[in-house]
């Protein structure tokens, strides 16, 4: 469906993609599982623009599956500076994103919303905006998803492979995040937990399951 930008893509402005996936309906005040995409859900191939090159990171599949079973929205929040830099366009992003979602469906897991920000200080034309509020580490994508899905951000979790993901989570009011291949750290009001092995993945799955139980109690 075309939007007010006049493109066939779900752009709310030239550098912001917001797409609702599937028809799952959620009651208000649920937490969400926020996920970075490149380097978290799929292998990061440096500005991925070819759907044929997309490979999932299997570590994330049980986390998404657990959130799906728990009735918790799964929301992808991804910076896409390759678009701002002119390496590829929104059509290539759409093709890659479609492939990621297709591979996830083949594994029996589902995403409920995708948000992407293409703004970057090194961009060209209207995308050359430094420190755009939607670009992580700013919290704009998480906050916008929170408004659209009526989420409880404080109870939500974020998983990503960069400190910018954790900073976005903290600024959005989340209490904890999991850093792929990272180190644990505690900041005022926010805990960064490492995600490097099966034991630490178990901690993430337990946290998601706890949110599901809290929602049913």
From Swiss-Prot:
One of its GO terms (biological process) is ADP-L-glycero-beta-D-manno-heptose biosynthetic process. Mg(2+) binds at residues 36, 38, 161-162. It catalyses: D-glycero-beta-D-manno-heptose 1,7-bisphosphate + H2O = D-glycero-beta-D-manno-heptose 1-phosphate + phosphate. The record marks 78, 136 as: Stabilizes the phosphoryl group. Its EC number is 3.1.3.82. The record marks 135 as: Contributes to substrate recognition. Substrate binds at residues 36-38, 44-47, 78-81, 135-136, 162. It is found in: Cytoplasm. Belongs to the gmhB family. This is D-glycero-beta-D-manno-heptose-1,7-bisphosphate 7-phosphatase. The lineage of its organism: Bacteria, Pseudomonadati, Pseudomonadota, Alphaproteobacteria, Hyphomicrobiales. The gene is gmhB.
């Amino acid at each position: 469906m075309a939007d007010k930008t006049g493109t066939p893509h779900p752009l709310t402005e030239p550098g912001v993609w917001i797409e609702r996936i599937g028809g799952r309906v959620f009651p208000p005040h649920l937490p969400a599982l926020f996920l970075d995409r490149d380097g978290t859900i799929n292998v990061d191939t440096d500005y991925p623009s070819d759907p044929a090159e997309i490979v999932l990171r299997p570590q994330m599949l049980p986390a998404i599956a657990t959130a799906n079973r728990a009735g918790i929205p799964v929301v992808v929040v991804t910076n896409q500076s390759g678009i701002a830099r002119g390496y590829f366009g929104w059509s290539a992003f759409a093709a890659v994103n479609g492939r990621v979602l297709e591979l996830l469906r083949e594994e029996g897991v589902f995403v409920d919303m995708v948000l992407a920000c293409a703004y970057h200080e090194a961009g060209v034309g209207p995308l050359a905006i430094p420190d755009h509020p939607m670009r992580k580490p700013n919290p704009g994508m998480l906050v916008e998803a929170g408004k659209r899905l009526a989420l409880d951000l404080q109870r939500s979790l974020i998983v990503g492979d960069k400190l910018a993901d954790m900073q976005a989570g903290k600024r959005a009011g989340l209490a904890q995040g999991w850093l792929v291949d990272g180190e644990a750290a505690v900041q005022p009001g926010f805990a960064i937990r490492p995600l490097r092995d099966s034991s630490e993945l178990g901690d993430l799955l337990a946290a998601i399951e706890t949110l599901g139980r809290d929602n049913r109690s």
